[in-house]
Amino acid sequence: MDFNIEEVSAVEREIKVSVPAEEVGAALDATVALYKVQTPVKGFRKGKVPASVIQSKYKKQIINEATTDLINYQINDILNGQSLVPVSKIDVDAKELVRGEDFSYVIKFEIVPEFDTPGYLGLPVEEERAEVTEDELKEVENRLLQSMAKIAPIEDDRPAKDGELASVTFSAEMDGEPIPGVQADNFDLPIGEGHSLEEFEEFVKTLKAGESGETDITFPEDFINSDLAGKTATMKVTVHAVKERKMPELTDDVVKQAGGFESVEKMREIVKQSYTANRKQLNKSAAQTKLISGIVKELDFPLPPSLMEDRLQRMVADVIGRAERSGKSFESLGKSMEELREEQRPVAEESVRTEIFLLNVAKREELSVEPQEVEGALYQIAQQTQQDLSSVKSYYEENNLIVPLKDRLLADKAAEFIYENADVTEIDPVKKDDK
């Protein structure tokens, strides 16, 4: 076998392979020998079938398998010998083996480009200190008390105010016809909490208990029901009662009943610990991202097109998926697919460049991912998607997603390594208004 490697670009390689007739014959003979051992033929004992019978009966299958096996063996031999690691599907342009004739084929694939790795150890980075304010603790206490609140009709004869509830029956019409699904009977509508359209709530706030009325409401362009988006309907409303939440005092008994806490003091302690741990992880993640981004923005190397396209498709799918999960249609985004792709392209480029850099660091530092870590990641995915582990594992294996998953885990390890070796300075938390 002879081969010639052509550098099509910094990220593309083309290899032309020539195979002499002798090797072609040996490859065909090896496949025939396997068929003799493994394939039963009526009238012959297993393993005693003449080669001529095997070649006559299974000619097409033998040629196909011999061609595939020879190419796969030689590709692996060339790639390992030249230390080439494809990051794309290997495209093979080949015909079939013909006994007695030379054979040639061409393979094309993409690789990660070579680049000078910048310094990544001991870099300075600021990280916000994890703190929990008294206001945040009060907010948790208020939510807990709200969960224990008793709902009762107000004594005053007036419409509902923000923070109260209106027991309503409503329906909607368009061109005199009722709109299916936009109706409810004796529904307790929280006022001022954003659970319904603002126009609708404002109208409800004009009606006292026992009063009815109707008003025109225009549905927003991104309304969950795309058939109604941007259209105007007539809402008919009856308010049956105006109610308020009567919250209990914050006592040990109340927090025991609400959340199983021993006391108010213990509840505050547990909440503070939980918030602090969560915030510390978030602050660490933010510092790590800032650290890596600072390195990557100085890098400039071409990206393998297949990696870019794969990452871009996933990011666009994520944007559409998030919109759909929040009840919005793709159309409500107000962008064409091409516009959405171009909007996500810079993000995808940074993501791919970051992963390539981190995998380079992982290789330099001899970091690795163990099989049990991959299994753990698959288990987490199964938990998050509420699927059984075997189904998730099969899906990842059948769609060749195990290697990308390992790469992501390896990149995460490299990012953690860079952070652990950074010069981290703790700073006061930045107020929300200052961010």
From Swiss-Prot:
A single GO molecular function term of this UniProt record: peptidyl-prolyl cis-trans isomerase activity
Residue ranges occupied by any PPIase FKBP-type domain in the UniProt entry: 163-248
Entry's localization field: Cytoplasm
InterPro entries registered for this protein in UniProt: PPIase_dom_sf (IPR046357), PPIase_FKBP_dom (IPR001179), Trig_fac (IPR005215), Trigger_fac_C (IPR008880), Trigger_fac_C_sf (IPR037041), Trigger_fac_ribosome-bd_bac (IPR008881), Trigger_fac_ribosome-bd_sf (IPR036611), Trigger_fact/SurA_dom_sf (IPR027304)
Assigned keywords, A-Z: Cell cycle, Cell division, Chaperone, Cytoplasm, Isomerase, Rotamase
Top-level taxon of origin: Bacteria
GO BP term, example: cell division
Keyword Ligase in record: no
Enzyme Commission designation: 5.2.1.8
Pfam families noted in UniProt: FKBP_C, Trigger_C, Trigger_N
NCBIfam families: tig (TIGR00115)
Record remark: domains: Consists of 3 domains; the N-terminus binds the ribosome, the middle domain has PPIase activity, while the C-terminus has intrinsic chaperone activity on its own.
Protein name: Trigger factor
Organism: Maridesulfovibrio salexigens (strain ATCC 14822 / DSM 2638 / NCIMB 8403 / VKM B-1763)
Phylogenetic lineage: Bacteria, Pseudomonadati, Thermodesulfobacteriota, Desulfovibrionia, Desulfovibrionales
